[in-house]
């Protein structure tokens, strides 16, 4: 990976990470479907993970890659819990639109 990083350059990884993060922010702010919002959050997390891997490779340190491994495990658990909640909400309400979720009362 070090050779590829030297050939491509860390600036391109930073640019790609920023673009992915902005796409995720756009999806969170402007979409009304809960599944699309979850996917956008995952895109944002993957953008940060890409940046961690690029910086850890650039500095020849494996701590960033280890952190990404644990971050991906937590993200997988987050998706499992989030989708289970969405399935439960869909069974009760019949919709997963964020506008319809505002009517839920605790």
Curated annotation (Swiss-Prot):
InterPro entries: NADH_UbQ_OxRdtase_chain4L/K, NUOK/Mnh_C1-like
GO cellular component: NADH dehydrogenase complex; plasma membrane
Keyword Amino-acid biosynthesis: no
Entry's EC annotation: 7.1.1.-
UniProt topology in membrane: Multi-pass membrane protein
Regions crossing the membrane: 8-28, 35-55, 66-86
An example Gene Ontology biological process: ATP synthesis coupled electron transport
Key words, A-Z: Cell inner membrane, Cell membrane, Membrane, NAD, Quinone, Translocase, Transmembrane, Transmembrane helix, Transport
Entry's Gene Ontology molecular function annotations: NADH:ubiquinone reductase (non-electrogenic) activity; quinone binding
Catalytic reaction equation(s): a quinone + NADH + 5 H(+)(in) = a quinol + NAD(+) + 4 H(+)(out)
Highest taxon, organism lineage: Bacteria
Intracellular or extracellular location(s): Cell inner membrane
Role of this protein: NDH-1 shuttles electrons from NADH, via FMN and iron-sulfur (Fe-S) centers, to quinones in the respiratory chain. The immediate electron acceptor for the enzyme in this species is believed to be a menaquinone. Couples the redox reaction to proton translocation (for every two electrons transferred, four hydrogen ions are translocated across the cytoplasmic membrane), and thus conserves the redox energy in a proton gradient.
Family membership: Belongs to the complex I subunit 4L family.
Quaternary structure (record): NDH-1 is composed of 14 different subunits. Subunits NuoA, H, J, K, L, M, N constitute the membrane sector of the complex.
Name under which the protein is recorded: NADH-quinone oxidoreductase subunit K
Organism: Flavobacterium johnsoniae (strain ATCC 17061 / DSM 2064 / JCM 8514 / BCRC 14874 / CCUG 350202 / NBRC 14942 / NCIMB 11054 / UW101)
